[in-house]
Amino acid sequence: MIEYRNLRIAVLGAGAVGAQVVRLLLEQGEDLAGRAGAGLELVGVAVRNPDAPRTADIPRKLLTTDAESLILGADVVIELMGGIEPARSHILQALNSGADVITANKAL
């Protein structure tokens, strides 16, 4: 079996799109890792309210309201919050910390 280096992934936002991205990372992580050529470790999901209902079952231990700390521990940040702020600030923080950023944010 091939061993890949792990990429630590942080997801910002768990609305309709974010929750489904998290679901795919959790359910198809091994397949995605093979395609990416790297292990994928979901380190957390930043949300406004950890107790809000979600469209996917996200383990409570992955949810946090501390996006800044989550970003600092990530190699890849997937921004799916929408809007301009705080998404813009979080993206800039991620880039400044050396993380790669993926976003579907049309406002930015």
Task: Report each predicted region and the residues it spans.
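Short, acidic/turn-prone active-site loops that include or flank metal/cofactor-
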Residues: 68, 106-108
